[in-house]
Curated annotation (Swiss-Prot):
It is an enzyme of class 1 (oxidoreductase). NCBIfam families: L-LDH-NAD. Homotetramer. Keywords: Cytoplasm, NAD, Oxidoreductase. It is found in: Cytoplasm. GO terms for biological process: lactate metabolic process. It comes from Eleginops maclovinus (Patagonian blennie). InterPro entries: L-lactate/malate_DH, L-lactate_DH, L-lactate_DH_AS, Lactate/malate_DH_C, Lactate/malate_DH_N, Lactate_DH/Glyco_Ohase_4_C, NAD(P)-bd_dom_sf. This is L-lactate dehydrogenase A chain.
Amino acid sequence: MSTKEKLISHVMKEEPVGSRNKVTVVGVGMVGMASAISILLKDLCDELAMVDVMEDKLKGEVMDLQHGSLFLKTHKIVGDKDYSVTANSKLVVVTAGARQQEGESRLNLVQRNVNIFKFIIPNIVKYSPNCILMVVSNPVDILTYVAWKLSGFPRHRVLGSGTNLDSARFRHLIGEKLNLHPSSCHAWIIGEHGDSSVPVWSGLNVAGVSLQGLNPQMGTEGDSENWKAIHKEVVDGAYEVIKLKGYTSWAIGMSVADLVESILKNLHKVHPVSTLVQGMHGVKDEVFLSVPCVLGNSGLTDVVHMTLKAEEEKQVQNSAETLWGVQKELTL
């Protein structure tokens, strides 16, 4: 008898039940690893699988995380370049793709990443046909559309991380200006994740008090307090971080874990994430943009209808037209 057999006797006859809350992260770059560690530290899954084409980097990252198993409550951490390792995932987070270069717009990345998705998405679908797909790679709105098309999944099982992070940046900056915690500053950024995102000034409130009610000029050129600059900081924020440290990682990783938590814990929380917005806010084309959505066990179950001012609605339509202009040129 082996030491293990002397120590432990097996009671159960049938095969043990596999993972119930398995999460896969595709891509072990900066964003993938920040997402992975954020998910692990929030105890959201009972198995974490990681996939990447860079075998040595993948193996090293998996080992490094496994070495911390004692400090985690996720029993199984695995990784392989073969997608069979992802089988039966409840949720798959796609962070893989070409990295945004300094000064490069998110839209410029697009065809490079479409080609990568043509390999990734069918492999995910093959091994986890019932999973929820969360796209994080940029440009996220277009790539969420691409993932939806390539996967054949119903729209409630495909979402993009969208403006969840933009809204978090927005709330942080508003909090700085008012000396409040971001969670007490209720504010939404919708539309494109990136340069044409739309701040909903009309909905900005603290404890139910509308800030635009106190300052009707808020968000306009004529505002003496120049609140509009905050949105510019949100848009420039990512470029600034990329310029300073070469990439963004921590905030997007935490944002991803925030979304994963709402889904796996069936929280029915409302998040600004990327979904099919055709028919909403006057959008005619088949595009994905961020609007407030309810997230739970089944994925993206509902959309909240925001009351937008005419100019806010126009900005959403402009975003949609920009994205459609790029999308219709894509070869899928």
